[in-house]
Amino acid sequence: MSESGEMSEFGYIMELIAKGKVTIKNIERELICPACKELFTHPLILPCQHSICHKCVKELLLTLDDSFNDVGSDNSNQSSPRLRLPSPSMDKIDRINRPGWKRNSLTPRTTVFPCPGCEHDVDLGERGINGLFRNFTLETIVERYRQAARAATAIMCDLCKPPPQESTKSCMDCSASYCNECFKIHHPWGTIKAQHEYVGPTTNFRPKILMCPEHETERINMYCELCRRPVCHLCKLGGNHANHRVTTMSSAYKTLKEKLSKDIDYLIGKESQVKSQISELNLLMKETECNGERAKEEAITHFEKLFEVLEERKSSVLKAIDSSKKLRLDKFQTQMEEYQGLLENNGLVGYAQEVLKETDQSCFVQTAKQLHLRIQKATESLKSFRPAAQTSFEDYVVNTSKQTELLGELSFFSSGIDVPEINEEQSKVYNNALINWHHPEKDKADSYVLEYRKINRDDEMSWNEIEVCGTSKIIQDLENSSTYAFRVRAYKGSICSPCSRELILHTPPAPVFSFLFDEKCGYNNEHLLLNLKRDRVESRAGFNLLLAAERIQVGYYTSLDYIIGDTGITKGKHFWAFRVEPYSYLVKVGVASSDKLQEWLRSPRDAVSPRYEQDSGHDSGSEDACFDSSQPFTLVTIGMQKFFIPKSPTSSNEPENRVLPMPTSIGIFLDCDKGKVDFYDMDQMKCLYERQVDCSHTLYPAFALMGSGGIQLEEPITAKYLEYQEDM
């Protein structure tokens, strides 16, 4: 847009302000930079058409460059030089760093950053800030606003002798302010300077002609309708806008001015309507406040009624328990008194012994008859001791499972919105957390709010909230070895559903270690089949194995086929997970040092003698006899849908204690600091087996297969993983 066009546009707006249709204060918020929250200073127009100060753009890019360098250094892992997948904190940095740096520069230059106005990523391209237009119109309006704000402060003449006079004009060509006398002296009639453009007193001087940022010597004289930005004729002939539809600057100026003027007139004409709508909104806000408080009071009343019913039932149940307790204690007391009387029968026994001394038969029979009845009764009590009452109160255990379920489903009337349900099968935690939920199609929600918090035994932590438009969300930066609770609620219009049932998930004990299967070191392509992504391997128990079996004689057996991870570990804590296919016959998983792997891989592949004791990492009897807690490897056996705990001299070796159902997903936690390796059930994040391991050497994730079998590495949870799940 030309200089005269911009000034005409500004003059039109200032005319509206002068007429009182628009106050200068009302446009103040349009003159504030969204980054620094101050009046614009040398504003630049971003590709998203928002403006931002020149210094703010530089600060944003420098901040992102610093954060890139910091994150890169923090996440460098000497023990994992071939680590491919970044940590969650790197996702944003990767997203904002794209190709855009000087050819001879070794450090990538950040050219993408989120616009502070719309929060969408804007790409500055290879030219960076130099490719942005300066918003002269906005700059002029800001300067006029500053002048209106400091009307009492005059701009002095730049050429007067001391003391200077107040300026009355500013020359845009000379970039100076003049009083009337100095202006006449320095712009004499009949000279070229007399044709200079002048405006009211200002301190903001701008170039008279807009130059193309891509072709710095060319003037802007056309407007690209596709990119919606001014261009020069070279841009149209062979530049980035060669195949775009362009129009003349005068035509674009006329069209845009008509649209802007029409829209401004419409907005000004609707001022009374807007004020009426604002009043209506104020009434609606007050009504909403009252209705919300009334709804809270009604909810409190309903819950208080439930509390009263519960208190009444509680009192009744406790009274019944107390009555039963008192009755039983009374029976025990009576029985105890009876047995206390038996102790007092010592005198009866003595009396009976004296009666036995009576020699007169008639006198003896007369006395002994009743005495015998008393002795017989005491004897029967001793022979058949039975407590007078039961001590157990099992019949008085309150069953609240049904009521608890009903209370958990407590919701609003059907006029509200149904409660979403979290899909436990599709929700999981690995390097990040993936939470998936579903909602009835007949009651589709506009949006959802996912809430999560870390479960802490010491104190109650507040819930973190994330607004989601879909029915799934990936949550990053969760703490390791922690337990989190997740719940979701739905929104439809102004209606909010209650929260769903909470889902409890456990995070891995250490950061996820990313690797792929190594297709070079020890990989036997005759027996093993590796996919293109190198995250899945299968054992082919087919024709090649039958050919190998021809050479197997009595006392010989086939060896394992090993495959390892392509990245070694020398320090730190690492966790990885995988799935063993249910049809697998025999699979060994764990860790092994590079030296031990070379020893295993040097052994004959097709057949070996049983006299050669191959190190399996567990179950052989010789290993039981010489259990070494500092061995440089640890492997466990999985097969036929069972997980076998290795034998140990310190624990029970009974089969029922060693054979467990095979988990759906198995995790391995290697702690080089403590020199141990743990095997986890990923579904419950529960440790199944722990063993010491020598971490003085480089350790590799190790796998071995025999017969039919398959291993699938757990895929990290990323945005691509979420897209794949949604497609399924």
Swiss-Prot record:
One matching Pfam family: fn3
Source domain of life: Eukaryota
Tissue and organ distribution: Highly expressed in testis, prostate and brain. Weakly expressed in kidney, lung and heart. Expressed in fetal tissues.
Outcome after substituting D518N: In ANPH1; decreases protein stability; leads to microtubules disruption; exhibits multipolar spindles; exhibits abnormal cytokinesis
Major location (coarse): cytoplasm
Catalytic reaction annotation: S-ubiquitinyl-[E2 ubiquitin-conjugating enzyme]-L-cysteine + [acceptor protein]-L-lysine = [E2 ubiquitin-conjugating enzyme]-L-cysteine + N(6)-ubiquitinyl-[acceptor protein]-L-lysine
UniProt-listed Enzyme Commission number(s): 2.3.2.27
Disulfide bond entries: none
Keyword set, alphabetical order: Coiled coil, Cytoplasm, Cytoplasmic vesicle, Cytoskeleton, Disease variant, Metal-binding, Repeat, Transferase, Ubl conjugation pathway, Zinc, Zinc-finger
Quaternary data: Interacts with CENPH.
Protein name: E3 ubiquitin-protein ligase TRIM36
Organism annotation: Homo sapiens
Gene: TRIM36
